[in-house]
């Protein structure tokens, strides 16, 4: 997992509430287990017209928002069925940070396990962030737990374990390997019994 200590990026806002995992990545695109190749299908039914041409009215298709790495969105983001592919699609598209009012518990965990930092901020803060220009950048300072922008600085909470994983770029496998000597010692002990 790629570490996030301080992330500086451009934003795009999709302020709908209750965006479910089927809207994030439709089930028709879940026919493989690789973690890449899903970005082109992110928000597919909204991003594309029936003829598969980009919908010019969809925020992610705006020419001046193509470099966005921070998604600002509504409440209850990632609700619906559990699918890790939703986090994969967001990351593959290039989003490193999602700022929402709340998340489905399973979706939140899928994001943290796959290197997408889910931040919770109140609606007032998100509405201000949603109005910044496409040229402006927002700073996510994870050690200080702050979202820093031209419209304000907003503190956020994150579990200390997840914070450590993001700052050090540790996924579950990397954490397991941190304890490899103890694992090997245990296996030798069990094998000798």
From Swiss-Prot:
Catalytic class of the enzyme: lyase
UniProt-listed SUPFAM superfamilies: LeuD/IlvD-like
EC number(s) from the headed UniProt entry: 4.2.1.33
Pathway in which the depicted protein is active: Amino-acid biosynthesis; L-leucine biosynthesis; L-leucine from 3-methyl-2-oxobutanoate: step 2/4
Molecular function in Gene Ontology: 3-isopropylmalate dehydratase activity
Protein's UniProt keywords contain Lyase: yes
Enzymatic reactions: (2R,3S)-3-isopropylmalate = (2S)-2-isopropylmalate
Keywords assigned by UniProt, alphabetized: Amino-acid biosynthesis, Branched-chain amino acid biosynthesis, Leucine biosynthesis, Lyase
Any one GO BP annotation for this protein: L-leucine biosynthetic process
Cellular-component GO terms for this entry: 3-isopropylmalate dehydratase complex
Quaternary organization: Heterodimer of LeuC and LeuD.
Function of the molecule: Catalyzes the isomerization between 2-isopropylmalate and 3-isopropylmalate, via the formation of 2-isopropylmaleate.
Family statement: Belongs to the LeuD family. LeuD type 1 subfamily.
Stated name of the protein: 3-isopropylmalate dehydratase small subunit
Organism: Listeria innocua serovar 6a (strain ATCC BAA-680 / CLIP 11262)
Gene: leuD
